[in-house]
Amino acid sequence: MESGIDDLSRFLIGDRGLALLYGRSEPGIETVRSAQPAGPRTLVRETDGAVRACVYFPDAMIDRLERTPPQQGLDETNVDDFAALVEELDHLLLLGARVRGRRSVSLFELELHANVSKHLVLARFLAGGRGRLGDRRRIWLRHHLFDKHRFTDPHAGVRRRYEEAGRWAVRFLDQLATVGLEQRLGLLREFHRASTAGKLALVERLAATA
């Protein structure tokens, strides 16, 4: 993903950074958050044609991931935190890529793209050296990434956005699982490059040819 971001650490903040940011009471800050309430989030502000963004990760979340690192195995103790970390980093990288390409990006597209990315990343970690996931592990991952979450945002439109992004991501991931590696890579590149409408059209096209 050509985001133009060479050093991610410059765009990451913790509890103190979040307090300082909100303490300035800057107007116009858009928030893109994970499914975790009061959890990590991507903060975006556009002023005078320039986009400023950063990702907030709670200190407690990073502490938990350091105690139970995903590279040593994924289970119920770290799957939610690791999924949220991947999701927010994907938001930042996609936003950077779209800004660099002078293209717009919707909140729905950010969520849809991140849902696909976090499944692919976590599946790789969960599979380890075994290659593709077996059915039991695939079902376990699907449950933790998509099935168990109930969005409680007070705004119905926000809830619908998260729910719809999850449904479209699952449809695309199911279709990817039916094709070979070379075709899968091509579809992922097409998915990434496409606009929101293009992503949905791709999913519908794959469904029609299944």
Question: Which stretches of residues belong to each language-model region?
Answer:
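Pan-zinc metallopeptidase signature
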Residues: 151-210
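Post-HExxH zinc-binding segment in Zn-dependent metallohydrolases
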Residues: 104-144
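Active-site recognition of the HExxH zinc-binding catalytic motif
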Residues: 82-96
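Short coil-to-beta-strand
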Residues: 49-57, 84-88
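Long, hydrophobic, amphipathic alpha-helical segments used as structural scaffolds
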Residues: 97, 122-129, 177-180
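Short pre-active-site segment immediately N-terminal to the catalytic Zn-binding motif
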Residues: 62-83, 105
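A metal-dependent hydrolase signature that marks the N-terminal structural subdomain at the beginning
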Residues: 1-52, 73-74
